[in-house]
Amino acid sequence: MSTRSIVTSKVSWTPEKFISALSYPEHCSITLVKRLKASVKLKDLKQNISRDAPSWTFEHLFVAFKCAVSNLAKQWAELSTTDKEKTRRMFCTPSRLNTAHRPEVFYLLECCTYILEQMQVVTKNTSHLYDCIRSGVSICNRLLDMEIFEPAISLLMKTHKNLIILLTYRDHDAIPTATLLNPTLDVSEIQLESCLFVPMVPASYFLNIGTIVVTFQLNVLRCLSLSQINGLSLNTINNLQSEDGPFQWIERSFPSQVQLANSRREILARLLTRFSMIQNNALQSFKLLILSIALWLNILSSQRADDKEFDVNQLETRILQLFSKVVQLCKSEDIEGSILNKDMTQLHHLLENLSKESRLHILLQLSQLYYKYNDFQLSAAYVIRGYSLSFEDISFKLKFLLFSFRLSIHDNSICFPFNLIQELSSLQQLFVENALPYSEALHLLDSIERSFRLFNDSTVFDDTVFALNISEILSWILSSVVRDILVEDELLNLQLKIRKFLMFTFHIIRSFSELTKFQSSLEGCLNLAAYYEDAEFPQKLSNHLYNLCVKSSNVNYARECISLSIKIAVSHKLTNDETYLLKILKNFQLRYHDSLQLQEKCDVLHTTFNQLDLYVGTTSVGKSSVLDNILKRIFNSLTSINDSNIEKLLESISYSLLKLFFKCANEGSRYNASAALSFKLSLMLHEKEEVLLLKTNVSCVLANHGYNDIKFEEMVLCVIKGDQNLLEHNSNNNAKLALNESLLCSWENLLCYRRAEDDSRILTIIESWTIFISRFSSVISRCSFTDFEINSILNFFFCFLHTVEPSGKLTFELAFLEIFYELFNCLLHLQFSKYLVIIGTLLSDKYMTLGFSGKAHLFYTKCYSYLRQCKSSPFINFWNVSYGKYLILTGNTDKGILQLKKYSLSSEEDFNSNGLSRTVSLNLLLYERIQLSDALFQLGYTTVSLGFIMQNLKVIKGLFSKSSKEHFNGGKYITWRLFAVSAHSNVCAARIYEHMGQAREAEFFYRQACSISEKMPFSCFSATFQLRLCSLLTRAGKLEKGEKILFDLTEAMKSTDTYHKLLWNYGAAEVCATKSELDGAICHYSECVKLLEIIKSEYYLFFNRNREKSLTKGIKRLSLSSQPTFVTESNTTEFDDWSILQNTAANLLRLISMFELKRGNLEIAKALMTDSTKCSIASFFNIVSANILKSKLIVCEADSTLFGDPVLRTLPDSVISLPGISHKFQKNQSKTKALGENTGFRKGSKRLDYLRERLKINLQNVRLSCEIIFSNAYERSSVCVCREVNELISYSTIMQSALTTIGETTDVDSSSASFFLEIPKALGFHRRREAQKFRNQHKELHFSSLEQILNSRLSIPDVRTFQDNFIDSLPSIWNVVSITINNSGEDLFISKIRKGHSPLIFRLPLQRHNSRDADEEILVFTKAQTELFRIISKSNQMAQNGKHYTRREDKETWWKERRHLDQCLQQLLENIEISWLGGFKGIFNPHKIDTSLFAKFSSQFQNIIAKNFNMDKKTPVPTLSPEILELFITLGKPGYEGYEQLLEDLIYFILDIFQFRGLHFAYDEIDTDQLSMDLQDALNAYFNNYVSEENRSHTVLVLDKSVHQFPWESLPCLNRQSVSRVPSLSILRDILSQSFVVNGEYVEVRKEAGSYILNPSLDLKHTQEMFEHKLVEGGWKGLIASQPSNRDFIKMLSGNDFFLYFGHGGGEQYTTSYDLATLKRCAVTILMGCSSGALYECGSFEPWGTPLDYLSAGCPTLVANLWDVTDKDIDRFSLKMLESWGLFENKAPFVNSTSICTAVSESRSCCHLRYLNGAAPVIYGIPAYIIP
């Protein structure tokens, strides 16, 4: 419908009808709006189309407007909260809103605005204009109430314009029409802000316009606040109180209307407060808050004057809150003092309207504020005002007094009208009567803390006596707080603050030289400390008095100090530590001397005895040198006192102290105690038997402590002999005495065995205990034993074990453990069941170690029956962890895990609390952790397992280091008993690191174990650990060192027991295996199997000892028999299970089978594998080992099948790729084959097809078998085993792919093959990094139980997500090339990995050229490796010696040899490229493929194949994978030297693909020359049309552990390319996933954020001369000719974007790998030292070196050298590299800058020795760019 028709159709509507419609919500619609506009427009335009047209007047419009506004308010009130929010959003985007969905509110507002516009049009006079203004303000009010500010902005600006017009023409009747026209306004918040100010008018006009103006100004502020601008400008804020601003308009508009004025003031105040919260400028916020406070104060004063109901408290609270915000905002750097004074002054007169309490609050805040501004005089003025006002308020009075103290410290010239000490003293009494509230106490403590801090640093105020008096008074005041009403958190908070207050007081006290004069002043502080249970202050004060005593030369003052010190210690119960003994000793020294009278001496001794009684009564007395000193002096002094006085003195002491004296008296030579004194002490003890037992037990303790000290042992033996003589006459019928007799006899024999290693001594010990049990087993349970006596027995028990265990006498250990098990079984009281659990568990574990699982289970079961009686958790835990480990080792893994979940971590205190000595407790705890670590290790939790062992080693290290500083009596007796457990802990740590592939760490811990074991006098103990070290060194590539250890032990092992012969043979077998002496390895492993049988027979005799009449005879027979009796089937019916021993034999048989397989004895290997399976435990490790062996047997069988066919036998020497044939082509042929159609391919012989199928099935079985165990192997197996599994998977996958015929479906794909090739490369690295993080994060393990450990699992990579997570996360322009050599060193595996593509994998046999040309020299891997090592070794040697040559002739010779080595290295790299890579070197070429040209080349390639293979039209030409065809492109344009040979390599590769996949043809019929020419023509066509583009590609080399030492970056095919390297794809992904990596591709380095270290060793003068000026000029933080500390080094790495190091090595001498592992961020690092980038090979283990440490620390880019370099050449390289990178010169903008990888590549050529020095620098990680 046209506009005209709309208009004509609506003329019948009258203004009254419109007004009616606008009054009702249901009439509001788009139609009404259109009608309204049409109707009003008719009137305005005066188009009288119809006589009935409506007649609109200004009054009609005004009424319609009011109706619409009223309706608008109603409509809005009825909307829900959700609809209101939706409507607000509609107003933000009205143009994009469908009109059909607009609410009525929207149309009403449109009507209002339109009517308002028309009112403006028809306005003729000021009255009309006034109504327009009122209407504009009204609609703005509604909009702002609705929080819709967008349309309100323009309305307010129009209203402001109208206001200006109205005020201008206020005295005129008419207004010029041109003035009222509405020009286009610049609608913005900034323009709106200027509308706040309206010109002031005369007072006579306020009646009509004032209210409107004020409302308008408030609406402007509301709109500005809703629009969320940054705040008001400073100019606007300063003018708010101007004549045109809202302040003055409010004051003049409502001179007598208080309520109206206050309501506007309140709104304005709230708006200003809101603006203060969104301001970005502190000054502006400050001014706004001041204005807001002024408004509130005006409201307060006017309301009080009006005297109406008003909530004064609420208003004052608001004012105080705002004032607090003002104080918080005020900072001298933001708000100047002059501005502060000026703005604060305007509030002074208003503050008088506040209540007294509020004024006190503000005065206190003002004093603090001006104090903050260092205006101490003005601050003091406010303090004085506040003090005067707070006369009756003691709380505020105290605050002002304390603040005056703080001001006095700053400025002692300030005079206060009061005496601070007197005023505080008067307050003290008031607070005693009226308790100090908690909140006031906190404020008081905070205030005094700040004051005391100032006092400590003040140079103006130094009156310490004054400060101490204040502390005393405040202490009494603080003591008035009622503690009982405080909650726990409040009390703790108060105690903490009081502790700080007391420490400040103590700091003051320390300044006094004569402290005893101020005892009264100290009482308040000591009382406060006692009231709040703080022991630190009295302890420090007591110790300080002791120190004053020691330092004082005045004897009397010293006595006063020590007396007060002891008094404080006693009154505060500080009598249980060593310092208390020192005070007793000092007091005794000062007061006792020979010149004293007898009574005076007795008094001093009596006082000392009383003081010692307090010590003995509050602590468990241990060894103490101070106590020894006191006792010596006491015993010396007793010699001058007669017997009667001695008896009186001894009668007054406690029984505990008496026993202590008696023990010391028995050590007469040590304490100078006479025999007479010992006799007196013994008489004072109760009865003879107790004296004897006590003395005997003391002798046992001395024997235990004196072990390993020859002189002391002699003394102990004499004491023991004397006790034995006494015992022999009393022990015939007394079980308790007989037990002590056996104990002393055993000690004597054990000490003698220690000296001579005489086995008869051990037999005597066992026999004596056997006799004792047989005689007293029935009566001993009725005897009562003290903890001291039981500990004496246990000390001997553990001492015996710790002595015999290192000797290797396993049968002695077993016999002794069983005897003591029977002994404690006889002593079975409830309190002794825990010892049975310990002994039984140790016995079970010993049987388990030997392999006799049945015997172990028997004693575990017996122990379990006692667990119900034993309620002590550490002993239950001890059994739980040992039994859990047993279950795991015997194949019951699930049960073992359930058992371990019952375990909770024990501590030394747990064992100590059960009455065990510290030595025994430590041993049990450390032993328990070894068991737990071993169990977790068996389950695959290597990181946590290592954590527990490192805890052990940390404890042991602390004890060893402590004991080395102590005398004999302090610690040595502990450390020798920890030798065995320490050695075993080190072995456990070594085994875990060995499992993780970290040979260097493993070697360290093995050597630690050897070092510890050598301190023991038993050769077998040391030999055990040396053989383990031998095994490690052999497998780590250090064969010579391993052989030497083995040779040194050869003679010793001939005369040892069977068990150690077994260990020696095992080590010998590993040495032979490493040397590839298969016969020798098999011989020694077979000998191990025989020795296991002998062990089984020997221990069978021991197990049946109960049939012997004497246990000793059975043991003698066992230890002395020369020809063992072998166990047969007939005599084992009653014998025990030995599955663990048999499992060991099974492992040996598997090893023998492996070597028989290498010898080619397939059938023998199969038979041995079958035998091993029969006796193997079904544990995880056995399953993995069995699967690996089974897979290798299948592979060997497959290899023999290959050699049976003339076609397939060439497969091992042929290049194999995955993929080969296009997947699409394979799929199409598979469909054709399924439909039964003729594929056109000729079948080969049936035999060949049969062999191919058989091979594929075998290879598939290998792959599937290994894939099944992969996940568990990755999580739990060693790194070596995991690599072995993955190599089998990769080999079988690629070989199976090569044999897949065309059209055959297969589940083999390159992504899964690449996954198994790449994943194990990072396993060792990640395990080591996790272990380091675990050790750094868990210095102490805090697991409450093993539940959370055992429920957690290692994150295992998933082959299904490999493509997404690893490959497709790479940058699209990257070319990742992975290089791996197999274990035999015969095949090179190269993978090309790109985003969006499946990996391309090649197996390149290094001898493939020899199969085509027998005369061609083969470059095998070992030969190339040896040549590289020779060149580098010679270069390293020459680099070190070159600086010593001074003669010209020597230098020339040196340079000649260096150049020759450079040429040798160049030739080696060229040979590697030609011989190893050949035609496949294009895999490194980052050539960007032109898709259209490539499609054309692919088509030509198909035609060439069809032509040269003479295929008929029915036979489809096999389509190769695009990745294969790209190899021809990446070889480059034909024509360069050697191209034909490279192309020939690819041609033969293609022929092999077709042949092995079932396309049969005769090699002789194919003209390879013609094929080569055709391909060159096609390639020339490609390159002639190819347009090169800028290539920003980057190549990342993923180098396996055996190939990393080669400088691949310097191969000719990689020359001048951007190349970096990483050890694994996983490490690359970790780097790319870091947050600072840009676009997942590179890192950016800020040029100014760097650090450096230059010449820290002071011997690189040339380097310093070259770089010093440039580094200093760069302005970076660094060190020149100065050695950094570890902290400096770490800070430079973590606190900057890049780090330069010009020194020796890689900085290893300044930091450690563990420190690097703690870094959360590591800079881009450039290490230009020799061999800083070298990774050192470790045989079958993982390499180690500086680069791995930096990569582990998160370093994204590391530049380092692979070998030693000469400084001048590498300095030249470094300078060129850093200039090219852009660090030393201004470069172009970032888009044209050079990455560090390109800079390194381009800088190699500047070296004189291009390869020897230029090839050494490499980059680990990803590219890095300098940000300009």
Curated annotation (Swiss-Prot):
Where found? Cytoplasm; Nucleus
Keywords on record: Cell cycle, Cell division, Chromosome partition, Cytoplasm, Hydrolase, Nucleus, Protease, Thiol protease
| GO molecular function (one) | cysteine-type endopeptidase activity
Q: Where is the active site?
A: 1730
Q: Would you say which domain of life the source belongs to?
A: Eukaryota
- Judged by the first EC level, this protein's enzyme class is hydrolase
Q: Which GO terms describe its cellular component?
A: cytoplasm; cytosol; mitotic spindle; mitotic spindle midzone; mitotic spindle pole body; nucleus; separase-securin complex
The chemistry this enzyme catalyses reads: All bonds known to be hydrolyzed by this endopeptidase have arginine in P1 and an acidic residue in P4. P6 is often occupied by an acidic residue or by a hydroxy-amino-acid residue, the phosphorylation of which enhances cleavage
Major place of residence: cytoplasm
Describe activation and inhibition of this protein. Answer: It is inactivated via its interaction with cut2, which probably covers its active site. Cut2 degradation at anaphase, liberates it and triggers rad21 cleavage.
InterPro entries (UniProt xref): Peptidase_C50, SEPARIN_core_dom
Enzyme Commission code? 3.4.22.49
Every Peptidase C50 domain range? 1647-1741
The GO biological-process annotations, alphabetized, read as:
cell division; DNA damage response; meiotic chromosome separation; meiotic nuclear division; mitotic sister chromatid separation; proteolysis
Q: How does it assemble?
A: Interacts with cut2. Interacts with rad21.
PANTHER family xref list: EXTRA SPINDLE POLES 1-RELATED, SEPARIN
Q: Tell me, in a sentence or two, what this protein's role is.
A: Caspase-like protease, which plays a central role in the chromosome segregation by cleaving the rad21 subunit of the cohesin complex at the onset of anaphase. During most of the cell cycle, it is inactivated by securin/cut2 protein. It is also required for pointed nuclear formation.
| Record's protein name | Separin
- Species whose genome carries this gene: Schizosaccharomyces pombe (strain 972 / ATCC 24843)
Q: Which gene encodes it?
A: cut1
